[in-house]
From Swiss-Prot:
InterPro entries: DHBP_synth_RibB-like_a/b_dom, DHBP_synthase_RibB. One of its GO terms (biological process) is riboflavin biosynthetic process. Belongs to the DHBP synthase family. The record marks H137, E175 as: Essential for catalytic activity. It catalyses: D-ribulose 5-phosphate = (2S)-2-hydroxy-3-oxobutyl phosphate + formate + H(+). D-ribulose 5-phosphate binds at R38, E39, D43, R151, R152, G153, H154, T155, E175. Keywords: Lyase, Magnesium, Manganese, Metal-binding, Riboflavin biosynthesis. Homodimer. Catalyzes the conversion of D-ribulose 5-phosphate to formate and 3,4-dihydroxy-2-butanone 4-phosphate. The gene is ribB. Mg(2+) 2 binds at E39, H154. This is 3,4-dihydroxy-2-butanone 4-phosphate synthase.
Amino acid sequence: MNQSILSPFGNTAEERVLNAINAFKNGTGVLVLDDEDRENEGDLIFPAETITPEQMAKLIRYGSGIVCLCITDERCQQLDLPSMVEHNNSVNKTAFTVTIEAAKGVSTGVSAADRVTTIQTAIADNAVPTDLHRPGHVFPLRAVNGGVLTRRGHTEASVDLARLAGFKEAGVICEITNDDGTMARTPDIVEFAKKFGYSVLTIEDLVEYRLANNI
């Protein structure tokens, strides 16, 4: 990737990662780009612990509509969330579990507020499997242990960023799309970020930062 296009968001990987961590700490979303030879997409990511209905509405409006809750394997086990399929043969091994809905406090589960309620229910410290109905309108993703150092995916990036910002290891993500329904690529993501004031970083930035700081 031509790094100069990302210079408005920091001149180095460390600057961009630190800007993203600070944005997370302030409860603001960030845009994360993966490798051009992978999905070549940009996801808008929020800390699961602080996401608001207004932020969820923005994800739904400007994203693909598939809003995902990225959580650790430990959390998946706590909630008894099995994989969506027995044999995952997707290209990038995206680790969807069964979909979920909060058992209480929601109506149809589709609205922004309902999805936030489902997420809050799922990440609660004392959450148990019966707190959730299955299926639902939130798509959990199981992050691999080791984060982006093990798998260079948006799932792992969101969990890593949440941890680095001092939050529970859980992030909410959605792929950004263009007005015509096509997937937003790097130039589109940069313009989107400038329009709404988001930080931008790449998964490569996060890998480099973690390796350099041994975290």
